[in-house]
Amino acid sequence: MVKNRNEIPEALTWDLTTIFSTDQKWETELEKVKKELSLVETNDKGHLLDSAETLLTITKNMLSISQKVEKLYVYASMKNDQDTREAKYQDYQSKATALYVNFGESYAFYEPEFLKNLQKETYGKWLETLQELKNYDHMFERLFAKKEHILSQKEGKILAAPGEIFESPSETFEIFDNADVKFPFVKNELGEKIQLTHGNYGSLMESENREVRKAAYEALYSNYEQCQHTYAKTLQTNVKVHNFNAQIRAYDSARQAALMSNFVPEKVYDVLIEGIHQHLPLLHRYIELRKKILEISDFKMYDIYTPLSNLDYKFNYTEGVKKAQEVLAIFGEEYSQKVKAAFDERWIDVEENVGKRSGAYSGGSYDTKAFMLLNWQGTLDDLFTLVHEMGHSIHSTFTRENQPYVYGDYPIFLAEIASTTNENILTETLLKESNDEKERFALLNHWLDSFRGTVFRQSQFAEFEQKIHEVDAEGEVLTSEFLNSLYGELNEKYYGLSAKENPEIQFEWAKIPHFYYNFYVFQYATGFSAASFIAEKVVHGSVTDRQNYLDYLKAGSSAYPLDVIAKAGVNMESTDYLESAFKLFEKRLNELEKLVEKGVHL
């Protein structure tokens, strides 16, 4: 039975008093920051470029207030997440969100004033006369890089007005898909009739009973088939918004606009898709192996997620902590001390309680600990989640300790590398420690499935996303028929399973929320691949390799993303890191195939 919040031992909860010792102090700080923001328009707007001194002063003031806003927000957000039923912290969350909006509105003048009125020559002279501006040089350099794509204040204001309209395709999808659409009733493994939901679909697809999987799969996609024209319209409109925004800002494409916003060259995307295409035979081999293990001659898409091992790993939290510390010790003393601090100083909210937010995350702000939320159940997945979130938290801690606030964060493009590197090292460690063939079989299957779902599947999404934006930009209509055909062909190309014999999968595009995120998913694939490459260097490389990795963790956003990850020895415009990742996939697939030949799966 799930406990109430007050029944959880204090040692297993996060210590948010290190942010604000009392709620009253949070409320006092909130009012103070609101007052500071109320003065911005009067004191700063229109004066940013009066002189080098005003540029420096207003920039420092903006960053100082931003730092305070983030601290207020994370306290409210985490208080709310620990028990979402508490009205007080729901109110705190609303107030903190409103403060974020207020901050954005107050400093809306900053970029347009900077880019419209400041020439690089003038800025260069100011740098010579006021050395302190150099502390923000990379931030200003990023702004100058946007210059040809920035809108005037008047244009920006006009386009800000229909902002809610531009959000409506994704919001309509979300409401329709999560609230309005009701899936049919199906039978579970016990033969009980249950209503199919997004929440239970995953567990039904992992059922050992093939009839249960088939029924859930067909029931789910019958709904998407029935509503395909509505989903096509929301997706088409969303793509049009992306293409429109790119066009008016003088980008060549929506993809260029999305990637350049994070200073990621388009070549990274192209190298990924090219590398994936070259190694699709490996995925086809893995599918054939699943087919052999499950003894299914007419293998279908609903057989993809069936666990190949029923080995039940169990870890209590104390064992999980010990294992995480052992595994992450490979990074050296500096990293290990931070991991120890995370456990000793209560950075982690461990157990599930009534009203607690589901899932897991790493959070915090520049001025706080890098807190983590878990919902520990003692499974192998929970151990992987622990080291994953620890990867984010130690990345954040290194960044915040080594960079000023202006560079004290990092883009999602870099974030997933630090977390999945830890997952890869955990896999390597568990495999190294295990001589039991059934254990090795389970671990290899776990990693190969993660690779398939993160690298191959997300790349399939990325390829689909690129194609639909290109087709819309050429003036073609994204009808449901076109989307079905494109997705079915891609799925056959990736998995080697006939589109004709798997007709339901052509509707999968309709259920993927990431297609509304604007060229986001490719980062999962690049991140996992880079992490596989780095983990191999850390485990089998030199002390220098490990130090280079720490240098990447410490860099934050003090340089462009590709320059930061290059510190860890990864060139993401080259196929080398992908080749290394696929080589590891093949190595582990080879071992799994040999174990199957020996009958270990039986």
From Swiss-Prot:
Pfam families linked to this entry: Peptidase_M3, Peptidase_M3_N
Active site, UniProt feature: E389
EC category name: hydrolase
Top-level taxon of the source organism: Bacteria
Cofactor(s), by name: Zn(2+)
UniProt keyword list: Hydrolase, Metal-binding, Metalloprotease, Protease, Zinc
Single GO term (MF): metal ion binding
SUPFAM superfamilies tied to this protein: Metalloproteases ('zincins'), catalytic domain
Protein family: Belongs to the peptidase M3B family.
Protein name: Oligoendopeptidase F, chromosomal
Organism in which the protein naturally occurs: Lactococcus lactis subsp. cremoris
Gene: pepF2
